[in-house]
């Protein structure tokens, strides 16, 4: 299948980025030069550059042009296991900060309620936290918990930064994950704002659950949204390797 010229421009620039023949801060060819080189209209050249900008590879400076964005070294993240995200990042030596964004009661959602093994009449709360490394937003964590199991969650939820730490305060000590599901999506306008990313930066969505090992109680249903350009994902099942 023939590749259209806009895609060819994108691919050629991406090859240079991957091969590191272009360096952060280096200026890209102008729309006019690209249009001339590939024998296309300026609009086609502009669309190619706009796509690269939306994907987070380049940035524009009004009146000066477009430049290659500096990228941070990807963070290696083990997606499963019994260690909290906070502990994983601290153990790896990263400067992690967490902002509690909300604690709200949700309407009935069959996926959430089934995962929590909650009754139809149960009150379920969603606690959202924004994760930042070196003050750069990298993930949104959403924890869904049943008030029947945590009667004070409406009062405590707005202050929670680590769910595992909260569970330990209540006497739960050892945790394991439920079935984990991975999917890919693109950010909504709200997620773009929170994660400081463009509309075409793919997001990795991890849906899982947390179970107390001793009692086998389902403590929470978890939905985590990661910026795909900030992590390398370790999916090895044996975390003690």
Identify the function of each model-found stretch.
Residues 17-18, 53, 168:
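Alpha-helix C-terminal capping/helix-coil junction sites
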Residues 54-63, 69:
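Beta-hairpin "wing" of winged helix-turn-helix
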Residues 97-241:
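C-terminal all-alpha effector/ligand-binding and dimerization domain
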């Amino acid at each position: 299948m023939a590749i259209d010229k806009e895609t060819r421009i994108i691919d050629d620039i991406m090859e240079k980025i991957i091969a590191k023949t272009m360096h952060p801060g280096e200026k890209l060819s102008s729309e006019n030069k690209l249009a001339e080189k590939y024998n296309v209209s300026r609009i086609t050249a502009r669309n190619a550059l706009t796509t690269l900008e939306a994907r987070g590879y380049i940035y524009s400076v009004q009146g000066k042009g477009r430049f290659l964005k500096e990228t941070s070294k990807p963070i290696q993240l083990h997606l499963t296991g019994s260690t909290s995200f906070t502990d994983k990042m601290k153990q790896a030596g990263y400067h992690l900060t967490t902002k509690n964004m909300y604690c709200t009661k949700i309407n009935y959602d069959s996926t959430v309620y089934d995962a929590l093994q909650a009754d139809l009449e149960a009150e379920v709360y969603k606690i959202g936290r924004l994760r930042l490394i070196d003050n750069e937003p990298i993930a949104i964590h959403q924890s869904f918990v049943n008030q029947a199991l945590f009667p004070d969650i409406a009062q405590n939820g707005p202050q929670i930064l680590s769910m595992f730490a909260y569970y330990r305060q209540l006497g739960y000590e050892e945790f394991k994950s439920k079935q984990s599901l991975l999917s890919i999506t693109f950010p909504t306008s709200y997620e773009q704002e929170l994660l400081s990313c463009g509309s075409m930066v793919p997001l990795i969505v991890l849906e899982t659950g947390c179970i107390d090992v001793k009692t086998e109680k389902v403590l929470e249903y978890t939905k985590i949204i990661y910026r795909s350009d900030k992590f390398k994902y370790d999916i090895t099942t044996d975390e003690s390797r």
